[in-house]
Amino acid sequence: MRVTLSAAVTADGYMDDDSPRRLIISTPGDWEEVYRLRAAHDAILAGAEPLRRDDPSLLVRDQAARARRVQAGLKPDIAKVTLTRSGGLSPRLRFFTAGDADRYVFSPGEITGLQNVATVISTSEAITAKYIVTELEKRG
């Protein structure tokens, strides 16, 4: 499995600030590249806090890319993955409701309330990048 890390950061190394507003760093051209990369991958991971704050859908937006995925025998949207300690995510978030994608929630302990909208993977092991990739590979 190939993994790509994509993150927008400010010139001084920040990904966000501590205000309740979303910090916009990316340009429209950046977003075009993000969407192109997204369509070529199997999964996208977003932390629980960005899900709470921004409510992203994390969909493949380009209709031609969606059609290519379906033609290749894939779902039109890539799998969505998140990490949470608390499980404090609303099942009404677009992460869970938008698109035709498999959804995975990783947690270091048992959580309830999301089993009807995602595959919940709870573990007492450390949740490392290797652990996440291994678990996703097991599930296709």
Residue spans for each PLM region:
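Active-site ligand-binding patch in enzyme domains
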Residues: 2-139
